């Protein structure tokens, strides 16, 4: 959801030429799968466009050099990411909610089914990242 929420916010601000936004998984469980149906429903309910062609891919060590920021939704994702990218000398890796000043993980809908709570957390994090003072 975060990829599409951030793309929508960037587009609304007319900044799409300044950002390249892409999501990737830290595990291999969903590789090749489309956006999860409840996530699509949540995005649709909020008018956030998404691609039916999007397929999950796993993050790679090369992504560290490709991207300015790598954002994890929760501490578990961060631990898994550290197995793929063990070092962060440039300080690129952050937790989503750290941008909001709230010291907790994004609500995980995988276990709760509460995609609305996840959407609101991700929206808050994405909006905070676009603020001029968004360096964590």
What residue ranges belong to the model's regions?
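Conserved active-site segments centered on acidic
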Residues: 1-66, 131-135
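Phosphate-binding/catalytic loops
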Residues: 63, 69, 75-136
């Amino acid at each position: 959801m975060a990829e599409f929420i951030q793309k929508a916010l960037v587009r609304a601000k007319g900044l799409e030429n300044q950002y390249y936004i892409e999501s990737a998984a830290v595990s291999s469980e969903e590789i090749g799968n489309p956006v999860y149906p409840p996530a699509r429903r949540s995005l649709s309910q909020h008018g956030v466009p998404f691609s039916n062609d999007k397929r999950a891919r796993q993050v790679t060590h090369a992504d560290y050099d490709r991207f300015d920021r790598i954002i994890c939704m929760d501490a578990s994702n961060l631990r898994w990411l550290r197995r793929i990218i063990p070092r962060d000398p440039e300080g690129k890796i952050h937790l989503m909610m750290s941008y909001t000043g709230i010291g907790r993980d994004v609500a995980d809908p995988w276990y709760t089914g509460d995609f609305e709570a996840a959407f609101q957390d991700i929206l808050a994090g994405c909006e905070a990242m676009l603020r001029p003072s968004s360096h964590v």
